[in-house]
């Protein structure tokens, strides 16, 4: 296959090759939320279930809907390859408070915080309706705030504030504390990106 979109397809091809060498038993020991029927892994991301054939690496949406975009599929492969189950300790952390957060804060701010602020803070009612459709848990923070189950034991919260004549719209994203150990910093950025894109698709 000729690679045309290097930014998205080259990383996917890299992790696809690693995926084919996986030991399914080792994956199930690390990730008890993941299923395996001998032919495919089953995992759930933001309420949608997907199958990934092994070792073929063919993705299927179990609800019959559209497949997630390539960066999301890459994230799911990295989850299977590298993540592990870490219990939620009951605390919430900003991106900056977690390991390597300071180093990645600039791309994170642009891709996640600013994008969330201007995507949802300018359309708070639509954001609320989308979050409700996704089964998110409402929070008593911000002009609107919701908690989402991302994958396995990992959860995220988004709070948005509507802009006015004096202040631009604003947003805050919090991660369950187990992200600090369960995901690399770059995957935490991607997780925020995926959450925003998924909410937006329901608006």
Regions flagged by a language model, labelled:
Residues 48-74, 161-186:
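Intrinsically disordered, low-complexity regulatory segments enriched in Ser/Thr/Pro
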Residues 1-39, 72, 80-134:
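Short Lys/Arg-enriched alpha/beta "domain-start" segment
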Residues 62, 66, 117, 144, ...:
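Short, charged/polar micro-motifs that form catalytic or ligand-binding hotspots
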Residues 1-18, 38-40, 56-58, 65, ...:
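Charge-rich alpha-helical segments
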Residues 122-181:
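Conserved binding-pocket/active-site segment within a compact domain
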Residues 67-89, 176-203:
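Ampiphathic alpha-helical segments that act as solvent-exposed interaction surfaces
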Residues 27-55, 137-162:
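Amphipathic, interaction-prone secondary-structure segments
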